[in-house]
């Protein structure tokens, strides 16, 4: 039996450096497919999709809302050819009803320990329209090593440099941030993987640069420290989302190879200034993630925010426009206030204004988004800042400072 696993193309942010990371969702899903089944993986962002080759079953993995329209197009084409099509992934969980119009079956939730029965249903011509495991999570111990051998790593380099591999040490998130749908998708409970499973997976990856994609590592101080102790002997360098603002945690993170952190910058406070400084004190670089268009943002505030980012010496910054994704508090509030402009999901890529801001016009917010990118990278382009981060990896002493070796 042969499965064709497709990761549809989506519109990238205009200002981002053109590099591509190996997708995580498809390789995690592939690990739940029985070993005796052949998998052909196509990342449409990196190679053309041949819609005429033969397979037994088509699986379409969608992470982003802006990816969904193309995924639906692909599903329609294969179904018109008589192929059975199953959809899964984050975007499917956010848009199940729409996806069902383009699918023979949709899988909602996490696939570990569950997908073998879907395969049996397919073989017996009893495929169900919906497999709904939302908030019904498999045992965390059942999450094994992702199946990365389906990837063509030649697609995931930038100027000859191999990009980071993605991996997770936990699922779920105890926080409930207003623009985020993680609580709906993965639950509000922190679900850490066993340390031996995490170490086994990290050790299996033929890459010394990793991205630990957990929504936040700062959910359990004791767990963080034990995780960093466990992975330190692997001597890999990694980036992640926030780490606990604690000297002991930061010390062990640095020793374990923390390279840089994606840190939300939500205001111009001394708290943020000190948060960035403390990362850097431990040799950890910082990429700020900044959402523009909040209800208290006006033109003057956004311009002062960009000035502040330059003052605190961020290594990188990624600007996005507040986007009302389904199943977020932002969506609920804006839907109730009738501030959502349209539901053209291709535009929901966090680089286009799809709602009515409170303190400015849609056009002005789009202009300020462009201003933020252009101003922050005026003196040193993004590609050079990124090159500087990669150069750090060649010098261990620039990553781990004298006091925390």
Predicted regions and their residues:
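Radical SAM [4Fe-4S] cluster-binding motif and immediate context
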Residues: 145-294, 298-307
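Structural recognition of alpha->loop->beta junctions
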Residues: 98-117, 254-263, 304-319
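Acidic, low-complexity intrinsically disordered segments
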Residues: 1-204
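A structural preference for short, hydrophobic beta-strand core positions in alpha/beta folds
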Residues: 41-43, 87, 240, 288, ...
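Radical SAM enzyme core and accessory elements
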Residues: 2-5, 35-41, 53-57, 77-80, ...
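Hydrophobic residues within beta-strands of alpha/beta enzymes
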Residues: 58, 106, 180, 210-212, ...
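Alpha-helical structural signal in soluble globular domains
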Residues: 32, 36, 77, 81, ...
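Flexible glycine/acidic-rich beta-alpha junction loops that bind and position SAM and/or redox cofactors
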Residues: 8, 12-13, 94-98, 175, ...
């Amino acid at each position: 039996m042969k499965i064709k696993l497709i990761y549809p193309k989506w519109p990238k942010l205009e200002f981002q450096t053109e590099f591509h990371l190996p997708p995580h969702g498809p390789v995690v899903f592939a690990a739940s497919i029985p070993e005796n089944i052949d998998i052909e993986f196509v990342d449409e962002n990196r190679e053309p999709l041949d819609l005429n080759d033969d397979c037994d079953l088509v699986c379409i993995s969608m992470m982003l809302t802006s990816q969904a329209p193309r995924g639906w197009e692909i599903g329609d084409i294969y179904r018109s050819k008589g192929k059975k099509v199953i959809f899964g992934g984050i975007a499917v969980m956010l848009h199940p009803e729409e996806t069902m119009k383009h699918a023979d079956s949709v899988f909602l939730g996490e696939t570990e320990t569950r997908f073998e029965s879907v395969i049996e249903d397919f073989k017996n011509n009893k495929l169900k329209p919906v497999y709904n495991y939302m908030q019904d999570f498999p045992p965390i111990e059942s999450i094994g090593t992702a199946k990365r051998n389906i990837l063509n790593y030649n697609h995931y380099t930038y100027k000859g440099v191999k990009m980071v591999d993605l991996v997770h040490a936990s699922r779920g998130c105890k926080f409930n941030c207003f623009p985020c749908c993680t609580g709906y998708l993965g639950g509000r409970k922190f679900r850490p993987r066993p340390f031996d499973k995490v170490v086994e997976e990290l050790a299996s990856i033929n890459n010394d640069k990793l991205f630990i994609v957990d929504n936040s590592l700062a959910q359990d101080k004791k767990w963080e420290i034990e995780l960093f102790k466990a992975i330190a002997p692997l001597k890999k360098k990694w980036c992640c989302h926030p780490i606990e603002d604690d000297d002991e945690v930061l010390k062990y993170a640095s020793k374990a190879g923390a390279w840089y952190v994606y840190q939300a910058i939500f205001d111009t406070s001394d708290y943020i200034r000190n948060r960035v400084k403390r990362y850097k004190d431990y040799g950890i670089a910082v990429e700020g993630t900044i959402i523009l268009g909040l209800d208290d943002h006006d033109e003057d505030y956004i311009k002062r925010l960009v000035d502040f980012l330059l003052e605190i010496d961020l290594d990188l910054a990624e600007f996005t426009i507040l986007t009302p994704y389904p199943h977020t508090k932002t969506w609920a509030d804006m839907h109730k206030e009738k501030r959502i402009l349209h539901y053209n999901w291709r535009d929901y890529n966090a680089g286009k204004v799809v709602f009515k801001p409170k303190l400015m016009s849609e056009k002005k917010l789009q202009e300020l988004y462009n201003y933020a990118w252009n101003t922050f990278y005026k003196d040193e382009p993004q590609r050079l800042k990124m090159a500087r981060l990669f150069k750090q990896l060649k010098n261990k002493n620039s990553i781990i400072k004298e006091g925390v070796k």
